[in-house]
């Protein structure tokens, strides 16, 4: 019995240790990431586009995917100067971005509704950027027989303005980039929507020649492997890397080092490809009814990673007609309900770990409660009460078992004094006593065993849900996704654990008793590193457990 109980305690300690390593790494990364956002924001400028060139311009160290019919084994790499005098600025209620007219790439994208730091609300979070510190951009173009992007470079588009703003009262903003081919007029159209992070991309091809225009659309995410957390900390951290859905698996993650070893090529009808980081992501979502070729790989000559799709079926535009090719690009927070509507399985980029089947319903419940009360802290408290109701009867059975254990504690002490030198005889007598008094010595472990998966799932849910990022509670707690700045909640949690121990029977094994006495102190130190939202759950859960256990214990004592 003692062996099983010690194994349980050891398992809890191990899980807690792994969780604290994870959370500590995340905190360190969050600080470093913030510094990067500040640097990026300060280096950004608004500049007007230059006069368009009739000839394609070679991109700066970029790679353009081959058309599906190409015999080339590798994409072509280019080198050229990247000027800052050819950019246009676009602003909506949710996005603040810069498009380079050379290729029509998104080279910077900030999220005005999300702050880099809680106390600096004038400094928006920067998701995409291209500077001396890091490279993370979204590219798209046309490849194939008549494509504008290829071995000879990329097109220089023209725009009607250098600044575009979504005006009050309007729900959409359309930005057209123009390029004149020898026998076609190419319009690259970006459509932005109010209260949305999803960008519609459409290529309009007006064939002014006397032969068919043939080409394929590609979309690509280009990023280096800069990891804001690599300078400090050890252990696990929130996932940073590529993600894709394939016919074989709904969600496949690939770290940078995996892509460096071997590229991934897959064909799929519809699908998506994404670059995932903590709280935020960007993803290309092509036409869900057409076949696409996806390639995820590392550049041959630079420390760059490319996640691309290319339409497998070429678009043919007859002379004197206009054709179009469409795709969508998402860049923003990982809102589960939003991602569910964009494409199948895109919501899996919210990494709830292996207990996702528990964490996901927990978030839906938490989100529903938040819609009623308007405060995430109160929602966590009410969710805790609901969870406690679910475990009410198993907990009651366990507390009755522990109350009976307290009742037979004097008899157990007598057996210990009588057979202390004969452990085998003492164990046999204890089993007889348990059977006679109808006591289950492991009954008190049941609530912990049942709640640990919920506790771990709740941890991941709080850690991965962008809705809790910078979400305030009351008084000194301004962000439930980070640790309590004054450690008030962890101290309260430690006190509740100590009170719970007083209600439980003292273990017969002296060593085990000492370990149990140290548990409140250990967990108090441990929970100082946990997010305040998670500690709040544990405090409320312990308080409700103490109340239930106290009532049951008194009822059994009065019955005697």
Swiss-Prot record:
GO molecular function, one term: membrane insertase activity
Keywords per UniProt: Cell inner membrane, Cell membrane, Chaperone, Membrane, Protein transport, Transmembrane, Transmembrane helix, Transport
UniProt subcellular location: Cell inner membrane
Stretches for region Disordered: 34-74
HAMAP family: YidC_type1
Family: Belongs to the OXA1/ALB3/YidC family. Type 1 subfamily.
Name of protein: Membrane protein insertase YidC
The species this protein was found in: Teredinibacter turnerae (strain ATCC 39867 / T7901)
């Amino acid at each position: 019995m003692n062996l099983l109980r010690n194994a349980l305690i050891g398992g809890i300690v191990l899980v807690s240790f792994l969780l604290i390593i994870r959370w500590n790494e995340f905190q360190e990364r969050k600080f470093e990431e913030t510094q990067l956002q500040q640097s990026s924001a300060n280096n950004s400028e608004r500049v007007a586009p230059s006069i368009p060139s009739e000839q394609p311009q070679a991109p700066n160290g970029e790679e353009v995917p081959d058309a599906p019919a190409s015999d080339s084994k590798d994409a072509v790499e280019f080198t050229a100067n990247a000027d800052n005098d050819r950019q246009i600025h676009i602003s909506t209620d949710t996005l603040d971005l810069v498009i380079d007219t050379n290729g029509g790439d998104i080279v910077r994208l900030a999220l005005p509704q999300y702050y880099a730091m809680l106390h600096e609300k004038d400094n928006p979070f920067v998701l995409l950027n291209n500077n001396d510190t890091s490279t993370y951009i979204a590219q798209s173009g046309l490849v194939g027989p008549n494509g504008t992007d290829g071995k000879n470079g990329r097109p220089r588009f023209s725009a009607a303005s250098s600044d575009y703003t979504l005006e009050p009262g309007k729900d959409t903003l359309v930005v057209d980039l123009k390029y004149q081919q020898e026998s076609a007029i190419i319009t690259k159209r970006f459509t932005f929507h109010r209260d949305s992070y999803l960008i519609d991309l459409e290529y309009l091809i007006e064939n002014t020649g006397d032969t068919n225009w043939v080409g394929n659309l590609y979309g690509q995410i280009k990023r280096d492997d800069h990891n804001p957390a690599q300078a400090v900390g050890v252990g696990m951290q929130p996932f940073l890397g590529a993600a894709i859905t394939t016919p074989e698996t709904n969600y496949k993650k690939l770290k940078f080092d995996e892509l460096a070893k071997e590229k991934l090529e897959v064909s799929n009808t519809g699908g998506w490809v994404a670059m995932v980081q903590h709280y935020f992501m960007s993803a290309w979502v092509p036409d869900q009814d057409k076949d696409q070729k996806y390639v995820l790989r590392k550049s041959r000559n630079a420390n760059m990673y490319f996640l691309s799709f290319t339409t497998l079926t070429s678009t043919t535009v007859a002379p004197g007609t206009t054709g179009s090719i469409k795709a969508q690009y998402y860049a923003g927070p990982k809102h589960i309900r939003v991602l569910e509507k964009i494409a199948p399985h895109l919501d899996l980029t919210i990494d709830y770990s292996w207990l996702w089947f528990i964490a996901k319903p927990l978030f839906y419940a938490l989100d529903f409660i938040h819609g009623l009360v308007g405060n995430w802290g109160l929602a966590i408290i009410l969710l805790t009460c609901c969870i406690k109701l679910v475990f009410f009867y198993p907990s009651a059975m366990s507390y009755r078992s522990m109350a009976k254990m307290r009742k037979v504690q004097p008899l157990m002490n007598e057996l210990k004094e009588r057979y202390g030198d004969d452990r085998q005889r003492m164990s046999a007598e204890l089993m007889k006593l348990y059977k006679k008094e109808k006591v289950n010595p492991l009954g008190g472990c049941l609530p912990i065993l049942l709640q640990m998966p919920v506790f771990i799932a709740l941890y991941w849910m709080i850690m991965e849900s962008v809705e809790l990022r910078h979400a305030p509670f009351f008084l000194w707690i301004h962000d439930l996704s980070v640790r309590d700045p004054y450690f008030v909640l962890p101290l309260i949690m430690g006190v509740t654990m100590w009170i719970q121990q007083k209600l439980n029977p003292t273990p017969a094994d002296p060593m085990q008793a000492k370990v149990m006495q140290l548990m409140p102190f250990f967990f108090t130190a441990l929970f100082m590193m946990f997010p305040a939202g998670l500690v709040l759950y544990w405090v409320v859960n312990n308080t409700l457990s103490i109340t239930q256990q106290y009532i049951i214990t008194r009822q059994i004592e009065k019955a005697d």
